[in-house]
Amino acid sequence: MGNRVSREDFEWVYTDQPHATRRQEILAKYPEIKSLMKPDSNLIWIVIMMVLTQFVAFYLVKDLDWKWVLFWAYAFGSCVNHSMTLAIHEVSHNSAFGHYKAMWNRWFGIFANLPIGVPYSVSFKRYHMDHHRYLGADGIDVDIPTDFEGWFFCTTFRKFIWVILQPLFYAFRPLFINPKPISYLEIINTVIQITFDIVVYYVLGVKSLVYMLAASLFGLGLHPISGHFIAEHYMFLKGHETYSYYGPLNLLTFNVGYHNEHHDFPNIPGKSLPLVRKIAAEYYDNLPHYNSWIKVLYDFVTDDTISPYSRMKRHLKGNEVQE
């Protein structure tokens, strides 16, 4: 159903990603930006409150009719759980406790993972560092869709289904593109998460468990906040690899919309990225950006020139990939 997209392959490029060069230029001109490279202690308390909020929600939905369980999973839980994945993104950059307490960040990420229902935090950190270091690298950056995704999800209707199923593709794509040996922290993350899920089931019942899992599935699928998955790096304009979003949903997502700023300065917490843009305005104001993630989702589905193939991809230079 729907028109078939015109693109039949990724956009292969033979230049380095732009972020390292821009970072060097900005720091040379505005060295005061280095003062923003420090942890955000407020993140700790925000995450704790979000976790406790979902714990209360688990209790409140345990005796509701199923239709209301699913309603609140989408209307409320999805926003909290998607926001929590972006809190975990912040924690993966050591923004909670700083780089000198890296393990504190790993344990805190496992704690933040609890209301999501699926072990995620430790694996995300491992793959996300590759995404920054090797942006668009073939066989390394698992943020890039597989060839199957680009080939199959090539009509309006299929792209719509792809948007709904995004959490599943993000979960299983690493196994096909860049499988890594399981680490002991991933095992710990999994054991703690499964134990927590079992406790929720036995103490509160199946409805609370379904609410938790459905909130994650809904929030990471067809949801306004999920527009950031596509907005960040899908090539709506030829030659532009990363795009920022400056709309109101940044308030719920730890400023993940400031994505050019984030890739330029991954050591700066999300709360300070607007300051980066303000200080170095001439580097960002003229870059293409978005003001609506909902429009991004709509345009992705309906535009016949855009598909999962609409990503800039590059061959890895050299053979060494750092863990």
Curated annotation (Swiss-Prot):
* Keywords, sorted A to Z: Endoplasmic reticulum, Fatty acid biosynthesis, Fatty acid metabolism, Isomerase, Lipid biosynthesis, Lipid metabolism, Lipoprotein, Membrane, Mitochondrion, Myristate, Oxidoreductase, Phosphoprotein, Transmembrane, Transmembrane helix
Q: What is the recorded post-translational modification?
A: Myristoylation can target the enzyme to the mitochondria leading to an increase in ceramide levels.
Any idea where this protein resides?
A: Mitochondrion membrane; Endoplasmic reticulum membrane
Question: According to the UniProt entry, where does the motif Histidine box-1 sit in this chain?
Answer: 89-93
Annotated membrane topology is:
Multi-pass membrane protein
Cell division among keywords: no
What's this protein's family per the entry? Belongs to the fatty acid desaturase type 1 family. DEGS subfamily.
Q: What name does UniProt use for this protein?
A: Sphingolipid delta(4)-desaturase DES1
What species was this sequence derived from? Bos taurus (Bovine)
- Span(s) of short sequence motif Histidine box-3: 259-263
Q: Which reaction does it catalyse?
A: an N-acylsphinganine + 2 Fe(II)-[cytochrome b5] + O2 + 2 H(+) = an N-acylsphing-4-enine + 2 Fe(III)-[cytochrome b5] + 2 H2O; all-trans-retinol = 11-cis-retinol; all-trans-retinol = 9-cis-retinol; all-trans-retinol = 13-cis-retinol
Under the subunit heading, UniProt states:
Interacts with RLBP1; the interaction increases synthesis of chromophore-precursors by DEGS1.
Transmembrane regions listed in the UniProt entry: 41-61, 68-88, 102-122, 152-172, 184-204, 209-229
UniProt function note: Has sphingolipid-delta-4-desaturase activity. Converts D-erythro-sphinganine to D-erythro-sphingosine (E-sphing-4-enine). Catalyzes the equilibrium isomerization of retinols.
In the record, biological process GO terms are:
ceramide biosynthetic process; fatty acid biosynthetic process; myelin maintenance
Which residues are modified to Phosphoserine?
Answer: S307
Source organism's superkingdom? Eukaryota
Query: Which residues carry the N-myristoyl glycine lipidation?
Result: G2
Q: What cellular component GO annotations does this protein have?
A: endoplasmic reticulum membrane; mitochondrial membrane
Which GO MF terms does the UniProt record name? cis-trans isomerase activity; retinol isomerase activity; sphingolipid delta-4 desaturase activity
